[in-house]
Design a protein with these regions (language model features):
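A compositional/biophysical signature of low hydrophobicity enriched in polar/charged and small residues
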Residues: 1-72
Length: 72
């Protein structure tokens, strides 16, 4: 399993709830600071992280994302 954290910038207030609807997003919540929400994803293959991130970027109102992949 590969875990990653995706930080999401979006003015939409319900972005964290919308992130939960994305396939392979295990958890999401709103945060304060430079980003507005965090999505925790778990995938079997490293290449799937890109697919999930692209899906998140397609959500209306998402301005930018930053992804951090767990290192072992």
């Amino acid at each position: 399993m590969v875990k990653a954290v995706v930080l999401v910038k979006s003015p939409k207030k319900l972005i964290a709830a919308r992130l939960k609807q994305v396939s392979l997003v295990n958890e999401s919540f709103s945060v304060s600071g430079q980003f507005d929400a965090v999505a925790i994803i778990e995938v079997n293959e490293l290449t799937q992280i890109k697919d999930v991130t692209i899906e998140i970027q397609k959500i209306a109102g998402v301005e930018r994302t930053e992804t951090m992949i767990q290192v072992q």
